[in-house]
């Protein structure tokens, strides 16, 4: 994960001021005491040094959607918990339509409580507010909380996933097929760095999302004997000025992946990498 954060950090700093200048090729001498041609690297060569261990990557500007950098951006890979970016879109839409309220209480099913991976250890029939469940998803990447929402909105997780795929099509994206709401490894569950960046672009149209994705740590079940500490899986929000989201991911199949957002000087960038 440190390597991923370093790469995104490098993209946010390096790309906007250099690589966004389409057609320009600058040459940098990294060692002023060296005078042979091997001492000099073009921007492209410097970028390639950063991405040796990454399968795919993309950086876009939010407002225009302009691609500032890409590597194998349309290649399909398991997206792990970045899947939850789409899940959160559907949740936010339900809230904005008034079909869900932050103060509503939802009940965990046995199925939701049985989820593995990242979780807040919900028990079957446990009740929790929409706001706290959403914190669990956005901050802690909780699979059990995600399935609670999926079952509430879709009736079943499968029907919720159908809605996720319908949303993908409505956005005109062609590299994504979801099989579950959480991102746990499953056959035929895939996306691309390109699609994840533009799915993220859709999510952050709901500006309320930043009230959650910028939280580094919080607690659930306060004033109980089962207090649960949430720590944001996205360390960039603590270490990189302007970082305000968005979603990390890791599974054995996917490797490490991250879709990150950051804003400085009225410009927000969205970076997505897969397969680190």
How would you name each of these model-derived features?
Residues 21-194, 198-207:
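Active-site-adjacent loops and short helices of periplasmic peptidoglycan-processing enzymes
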Residues 15-16, 97, 224:
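Residues in and immediately flanking transmembrane alpha helices
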